[in-house]
């Protein structure tokens, strides 16, 4: 759907920003479905594909989240975004053996690891499609879980505001490769 906007991977990664101000234009459902289709290719533990997405457009649900379940700085972002994605993961599949025991010392932390990979892939696919995103991690998990009526086997991993950017911030500073890379 967005062939005219295609960019290479490096350009997509280097130009993506966390967007906190959005235009009011709605997001076409076909476009969102294309982004989700791309994000579905995120790597996951034993290809478990545990991430699920709930697209929230209903103003009464958005208002409830803003007024009751997020701090003001996140509520201000959600207020402007035409859509909010509640990203969940299916519990008990990543990092586990069939008998329910942990495969590694990391235990069930692989669930959030896989959710993080999927969130990044979702945000990069949205950026390539001309949309902006910001991942939010501070919210009332119990309240949002009850409000959105998640299945019992799912857990909220992130809220992602998404829409057409109304700002284009500069890149923040980055650490040098020398600070990030060690050879042994």
State where each predicted segment sits.
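A glycine-rich helix N-cap at a beta->alpha junction
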Residues: 75-84, 149-171
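Glycine/small-residue-rich phosphate/adenosyl-binding loop
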Residues: 47-115
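Short amphipathic alpha-helical segments
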Residues: 32-37
């Amino acid at each position: 759907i967005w062939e005219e906007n295609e960019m290479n991977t490096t350009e997509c990664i280097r130009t993506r920003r966390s967007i906190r101000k959005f235009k009011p234009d709605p997001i076409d459902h076909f476009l969102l479905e294309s982004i989700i289709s791309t994000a579905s290719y995120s790597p996951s533990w034993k290809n478990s594909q545990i991430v699920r997405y709930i697209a929230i457009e209903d103003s009464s649900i958005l208002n409830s989240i803003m007024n009751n379940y997020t701090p003001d700085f996140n509520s201000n972002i959600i207020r402007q975004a035409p859509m909010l994605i509640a990203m969940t993961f299916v519990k008990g599949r990543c990092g586990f053996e069939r008998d329910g025991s942990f495969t590694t010392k990391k235990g069930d932390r692989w669930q959030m690891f896989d959710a993080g990979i999927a969130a990044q892939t979702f945000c990069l696919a949205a950026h390539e499609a001309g949309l902006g995103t910001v991942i939010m991690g501070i919210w009332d998990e119990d309240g949002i879980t009850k409000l959105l009526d998640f299945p019992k086997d799912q857990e909220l991993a992130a809220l992602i505001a998404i829409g057409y950017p109304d700002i284009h911030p500069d890149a923040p500073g980055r650490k040098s490769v020398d600070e990030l890379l060690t050879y042994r």
